[in-house]
Amino acid sequence: MFILRVHSVDSERPISVEEEESGFTYASKRAQPPLKLIQPSLKLTDRKGLIHLYRKSSHSSLPNPSSRSTTLFIVAVPNYLSSLDFIRFCDSRISQVSDILFIRNDGMEDRYSVLITFSDQSEADGFYNNLNGKKFAPSEAEVCHILYVMSVEHTEFDEVAAEAPTGFTELPTCPICLERLDPDTSGIVSTLCDHSFQCSCTSKWTYLSCQVCRLCQQQDEILNCSICGKTENVWACLVCGFVGCGRYKEGHSIRHWKETHHCYSLDLRTQQIWDYVGDSYVHRLNHSKIDGKSVEMSTSCLSHQGDCGLCECSEDTGISGAIFNSKVDSIVIEYNDLLASQLKGQRQYYESLIVEARSKQESSIAEAVEQIVVNTMQELQNKIEKCEEEKSGITEVNTKLIKEQDTWRKKAKEIEEREAALLGSKDEMITDLQEQIRDITVFIEAKKTLKKMSSDTDGIREGTVLPVPISPEPVSSVRRQKKSNRRK
């Protein structure tokens, strides 16, 4: 049973039958009867969105009565069929349909999908049995693929639509990619041709919007991993078309599965499909090594190349199984021994690389330290020489200043002595002048007295002369006498 999630980018729009009939359609090239079987209660709507198709991880073959529902999903309808052309394709089985929703994707203009809801389970089963696997047009290659849908969810968020429900895995919506999957995986029971991507049928398909189909048709181009660019062991995701290298290279393909949970990947060289969840191949067809033709692939076959003589699906399962198990055991032992020896060699090799790297690191560190020490010593030596030059200059200046200091000291002492002598001579001169002034003053006063006495002669005549006591001669008079003598 399938679950459908639609990332809607707009709301549902009703479709007018009259407007559709007035337009040009692919079917209008031929004479088509008018649409008289459409019930008035039929709801025809159109919507744009991106479809995500999910199926239960525990696969089971179809048809299965317990996995039916009244909602059917047509995977891919070619765009040359208009809405009314598709209704004409359904013919009289459209009478019991209650709702038809056409889902279109702007990124896939060559096809659209259809969601049909029936009012009765028997009518849904009849529609499925009569139209599933039928060509849309006799001259075209496209086949109608119908799936039973358990539930349909519409969301405006791409993250919600792209997240797989618990226990479900996402399937591609391209019909060719679905047909190449195992029936237990895709839910498509049969196919009209092998779709080996080299037959004329594939070239007539118009689904060039499928990235995987374009990659398979580009036989002349060299395909490479979209992450690392490797050209060997390249795989393509069936759901989104991501191209990555296998697990024996950089493992970008399996990394993509872990990130997006898109578990189906196509080997672009062998056209084989691998299921990462089931850890096995799930492709419907395999190419024979002998004649290059496509042969049916058993789902229980364990061999990569589809050679059932080496696995449990052969006729004699007991003997073949024992032989296969013994071969597997011997190969496992051989590869374990080889792996152990290789790991030991790799360990020794990487240990030697580590030792060499450490020695190189230590030598480089020692050289760097030595260079730093040399540079530091050179800088210190330059500073010492500069300081010594400054010291010698300062010493010379200091010596010169000391000499000048002694000279100025002598000059100052001489000046002090000269000033002291000059001051002494000035003091003596001042003292001498003072004594002279006093003498002159005494002389003048004595002269005045004598003049006065001369005018009064009578008093002198009647006077008495008395003796005057002799006093020691003052030093000043002695000095004056010396000076007077000196002057003489």
UniProtKB/Swiss-Prot annotation:
Presence of keyword Zinc-finger: yes
TM annotation in the entry: none
Compositional bias of kind Low complexity: 465-478
SUPFAM superfamilies: RING/U-box (SSF57850)
Keywords: Coiled coil, Hydrolase, Metal-binding, Transferase, Ubl conjugation pathway, Zinc, Zinc-finger
Reaction(s) the record says it catalyses: S-ubiquitinyl-[E2 ubiquitin-conjugating enzyme]-L-cysteine + [acceptor protein]-L-lysine = [E2 ubiquitin-conjugating enzyme]-L-cysteine + N(6)-ubiquitinyl-[acceptor protein]-L-lysine
Gene Ontology cellular-component terms listed: ubiquitin ligase complex
ZnF bounds (RING-type): 174-214
Coiled coil regions, renumbered to chain: 370-418
MF-aspect GO terms: hydrolase activity; protein heterodimerization activity; ubiquitin-protein transferase activity; zinc ion binding
Residues engaged in binding Zn(2+) 1: 225, 228, 245, 252
Zinc finger (UBP-type): 208-301
CDD domains cross-referenced by the UniProt entry: RING-H2_BRAP2 (cd16457), RRM_BRAP2_like (cd12437)
Chain intervals with Basic residues compositional bias: 479-488
EC number per UniProt: 2.3.2.27
Region called Disordered, residue ranges: 453-488
Gene3D superfamilies listed in its UniProt record: Zinc/RING finger domain, C3HC4 (zinc finger)
Gene Ontology terms: biological process: protein ubiquitination; regulation of seed germination
Reported consequences of knocking out the gene: Viable heterozygous plants seeds are slow to emerge from the seed coat; emerged embryos remains white with unexpanded cotyledons thus leading to growth-arrested seedlings.
Pathway the protein acts in: Protein modification; protein ubiquitination
Residues holding Zn(2+) 2: 237, 240, 256, 262
Subunit relationships: Component of the heteromeric E3 ligase complex made of BRIZ1 and BRIZ2. Forms heterooligomers with BRIZ2 via coiled-coil domains.
Function recorded in the entry: RING-type ubiquitin E3 ligase required for seed germination and post-germination growth.
Name of this chain's protein: BRAP2 RING ZnF UBP domain-containing protein 1
Gene name linked to the record: BRIZ1
